[in-house]
Swiss-Prot record:
Keyword Signal: yes
Xref: Gene3D superfamilies: 1.10.10.2470
Localization, UniProt: Secreted; Host nucleus; Host cytoplasm
Regulation: induction: Expression is induced during host plant infection.
Stated name of the protein: RxLR effector protein PITG_14783
Role according to the record: Effector that enhances P.infestans colonization of Nicotiana benthamiana leaves.
InterPro entries associated with the record: PexRD2_WYL
Chain ranges passing through the membrane: none
Length: 130
């Protein structure tokens, strides 16, 4: 019976000593829209890309055209110029991290996902030859 009282007294002591109790005074916070002298860094708007019309991913029509033309994933990686990086990324995490930040890798992974969906759509034969 006395053990819960000991725990309650211990917790109350810890809460009081750590100032973890609720304080009714609200902190004086500045709103994010106001600028004061204490802000050392100015928030600048990001510079837009030089070519805003550039597409960074493949459309479904482009992927279908590549698939029907017989382009494999390796052929597409060579076309993007990342074939060597893809091979090196299999053994090096740093190369993989750098590769994953490029637009070419985004196109590569989009085409990889498209190819895997196309392979899932193929139905297996109804009978198997032994």
């Amino acid at each position: 019976m006395r053990l819960p009282y000991v725990f309650a007294a211990t917790m109350a002591t810890l809460l009081v000593s750590s100032n973890a109790l609720v304080n009714s005074n609200q902190a004086m916070l500045s709103s994010p829209n106001e600028q004061h002298q204490r802000q050392l860094r100015s928030h600048q708007t990001p510079v837009e890309d030089q070519e805003p019309d550039e597409e960074r991913s493949l459309s479904k029509a482009e992927m279908k055209r590549l698939f029907e033309a017989g382009n494999s994933l390796d052929d597409f990686a060579k076309h993007l110029g990342i074939a060597d990086d893809v091979v090196r990324a299999q053994s090096s995490n740093t190369v993989l991290q750098r590769l994953m930040q490029t637009d070419e890798y985004m196109k590569y992974s989009t085409y990889l996902n498209f190819l895997s969906k196309q392979n899932k759509k193929k139905k297996p034969p109804t009978f198997y030859h032994l």
